[in-house]
Amino acid sequence: MATPSNKNSKSHKRNRRGHIGLNVPNIVLDKTTGEYRVAHRVSPSGVYNGKQVIEK
């Protein structure tokens, strides 16, 4: 069974984990409503790619 050869300090451990990070969502400006929304998703008004896909 594998065992650690040296102790990893708290700072080394946190530095390693600090590179993992979080991804920022891709937010775009909606042309029809002028509001921000997540890219490649239907807007709350039901418009996607300039076309009405969900009737309200």
From Swiss-Prot:
Pfam families from the UniProt entry: Ribosomal_L32p
Tagged with keyword RNA-binding: no
Annotated Gene Ontology cellular component terms: large ribosomal subunit
Statement: the UniProt record of this protein carries the keyword Cell membrane: no
GO molecular function, one term: structural constituent of ribosome
Chain spans, region Disordered: 1-23
Keywords for this protein: Ribonucleoprotein, Ribosomal protein
Family membership: Belongs to the bacterial ribosomal protein bL32 family.
Protein name: Large ribosomal subunit protein bL32
Protein's organism: Leuconostoc citreum (strain KM20)
